[in-house]
């Protein structure tokens, strides 16, 4: 364990449940790496993701973005391909891109968008894109004919959230350089989206635990009952 991490750990009481402002403030103060660390939110939910009716998945545009330059690949043809290029997509194509991904194991992009008519083609590389979280999905707004809107939202700071096998959602909410106030705005937007996405089949306490941490720093726990205060 590094010296900086040990020093940072002393600032955070591991047994405490902070309010969101306190936790984010501590996370910013304990991010001591020599680069602009990403601040991440980790929420354990009271769901059983093995059941189809307890999946939590969606997307939300963070008001202050993520601080990350996002590279967007779009599968589209004709007018929709032109629309994607004009909207600022980094890569646009169809079967040619499928072949490139298959033959070169090519992943120089962060988000994949596809028009619905292209999903048959994209499906050929589902086994490759799926495990990397890159498969376009209607729930996250990445399967759409409105490619210009999808690209604009992604570039503006749209993040996808999805509960993993251990019932936890991991999501970036910005960079250390944002400061506490902007991080709090992003945190609140994402938490509100998670609360709205609560499955009807989920019983008992929904927000089990909430932690924020920087890339290299320790985590600060937030009181789940006061997450949106």
UniProtKB/Swiss-Prot annotation:
Coiled coil: none annotated. GO terms for cellular component: large ribosomal subunit. One of its GO terms (biological process) is translation. Keywords: Repressor, Ribonucleoprotein, Ribosomal protein, RNA-binding, rRNA-binding, Translation regulation, tRNA-binding. It comes from the Bacteria. InterPro entries: Ribosom_uL1_bac-type (IPR005878), Ribosomal_uL1 (IPR002143), Ribosomal_uL1-like (IPR023674), Ribosomal_uL1/biogenesis (IPR028364), Ribosomal_uL1_3-a/b-sand (IPR016095), Ribosomal_uL1_CS (IPR023673). It holds the Pfam family Ribosomal_L1. GO terms for molecular function: rRNA binding; structural constituent of ribosome; tRNA binding. Part of the 50S ribosomal subunit. Belongs to the universal ribosomal protein uL1 family. HAMAP family: Ribosomal_uL1_B (MF_01318_B). PANTHER family: 54S RIBOSOMAL PROTEIN L1, MITOCHONDRIAL (PTHR36427), LARGE RIBOSOMAL SUBUNIT PROTEIN UL1M (PTHR36427:SF3). Binds directly to 23S rRNA. The L1 stalk is quite mobile in the ribosome, and is involved in E site tRNA release. Protein L1 is also a translational repressor protein, it controls the translation of the L11 operon by binding to its mRNA. This is Large ribosomal subunit protein uL1. It comes from Clostridium botulinum (strain Eklund 17B / Type B). The lineage of its organism: Bacteria, Bacillati, Bacillota, Clostridia, Eubacteriales.
């Amino acid at each position: 364990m590094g010296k900086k991490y040990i020093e940072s750990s002393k600032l955070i009481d591991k047994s405490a449940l902070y309010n969101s402002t306190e936790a984010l403030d501590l996370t910013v103060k304990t991010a001591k790496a020599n680069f602009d660390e990403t601040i991440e939110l980790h929420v354990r939910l009271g769901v059983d993701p093995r059941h189809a009716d307890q999946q939590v998945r969606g997307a939300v545009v963070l008001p202050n973005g993520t601080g990350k330059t996002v590279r967007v690949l779009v599968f589209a043809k004709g007018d929709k391909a032109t629309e994607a290029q004009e909207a600022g997509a980094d890569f646009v194509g169809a079967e040619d891109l499928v072949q490139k991904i298959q033959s070169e194991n090519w992943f120089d992009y962060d988000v994949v968008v596809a028009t619905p008519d292209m999903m048959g083609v994209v499906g050929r590389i589902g086994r490759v894109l799926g495990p990397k979280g890159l498969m376009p999905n209607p729930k996250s707004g990445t399967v759409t004919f409105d490619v210009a809107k999808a690209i604009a939202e992604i570039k503006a700071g749209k993040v996808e959230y999805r509960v993993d096998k251990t019932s936890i959602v991991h999501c970036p909410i910005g960079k250390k350089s944002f400061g506490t106030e902007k991080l709090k705005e992003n945190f609140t937007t994402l938490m509100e989206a998670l609360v709205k996405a609560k499955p009807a089949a989920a019983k008992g306490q929904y927000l089990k635990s909430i932690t924020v941490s920087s890339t290299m720093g320790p985590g600060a726990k937030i009181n789940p009952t006061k997450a949106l205060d």
